[in-house]
Amino acid sequence: MEGRSVEVVPVSQLLTRSFYIPAYQRGYRWTQDQVEDLLNDIHDFFPREVPGSEDKTWYCLQPLVVRPVDSSEIVIKDMTSNKIEYELIDGQQRATTIYLIGHYINEMFRGKIKESELSLRYETRFSSTDFLKNLSVGTDENVAIDSSNIDFYHISKAYQTIHSWVTRLNAEGRFKQDRF
C-alpha cells in the first residue's frame, strides 16, 4: 500500500481536473431515481457552523477512486490536447453525473461566463466525450433523447432528468441555484 493515500477534495477542485475513463469501465447507466437522489442530496444539504470553529460542515459524495497518471501512459484516439491527470478507477457514474449537473447549470444559469467542468476522456467510447460537451436543452425547452447508442441514451435521459428536476423546483419556487 506504499504510495497510496486518501485525499478529501471539494467538488469545485474536481472541476479543474482531467479524468481518463479506461476501457474496463462500463458505460453510463444511472437511472432517473439515482440522478434525482444525488440532486436532492446536494440541494437539501445546508452547511452549518461547526461549534468552536470558523469552519462549516460540507457535503460529502461517495468517493471517486483515482490514480494519478502521466499522459504518456494513455493512448486515446484523436487526443490532441487536454492533459490527463487521473485514471478514474471507481466512481465513473458519479463523476459523469456531476459533469452533467455542472454542464446543465452552466448552460441554463451562468450565461456567458462558464464555470469549469470536469474533463472526461474515454479510452474506447470516443464519441461520448463530444456527446457530453454538446448536450443542451432545445429551444422548445426539451432535452432530445438520443437512442443512437446505449451510452447516449442513458446520458441524455440523465440530462433530461436534471432539466425536469430543476424546472419542477423552479416552478415551485424551491430551486436554490447557490447550492450548486
Model-derived segments and spans:
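Glycine- and hydrophobic-rich flexible loops that cap the catalytic core of alpha/beta enzyme folds
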Residues: 1-180
